[in-house]
Amino acid sequence: MLTIRSAKPQDAEALLAIYAPYVTDTAITFEYDVPTAEEFRSRIENTLKKYPYLVAEKDDRILGYAYAGVFKGRAAYDHCVETSIYVEQSCQGMGIGKILYNALEEVLKQQGILNVNACISWIDTPNEYLTHQSPDFHAHMGYEKVAHFHLCGYKFNITQPS
């Protein structure tokens, strides 16, 4: 049975194992280098000071995680967040992301968050680094496109339109 729980700093290595292929093989994240376990641990700790950071676990194995963070660094944005979600690539399409996001959104609602944003990479013609899987997932979850930043990211010697 899949369980959702709050992430702990000691989950860093398991979460990093899920995240690393997104860094090295995709333009889903614009991060170029895989962070160290210590850096990832620090990210978890910093996020948990204010926002939820959830993991999906089955049989003591973490299969995915989702968290919220600062949308913009100004006080007027305090009731808005940016979300991120990563599911182990071999487990995609199994409903884990939907369960994680539903749980994350419930916690955010309890915290008084009014606006949940997902900043998603987009490319008109999918390639080996970027597909429409994330935008399609977010649309399925009820997210609506509200902006488009043109030629905003550069990774793998390709300008990603974002």
Q: What would you call each of these model-derived segments?
A:
Residues 17-34, 47:
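Helix-loop element at the rim of GNAT/NAT acetyltransferase active sites that forms part
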Residues 32-90, 107:
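Acetyl-CoA-dependent GNAT
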Residues 93-106, 132-136, 140:
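Conserved acetyl-CoA-binding loop-helix of GNAT-fold acetyltransferases
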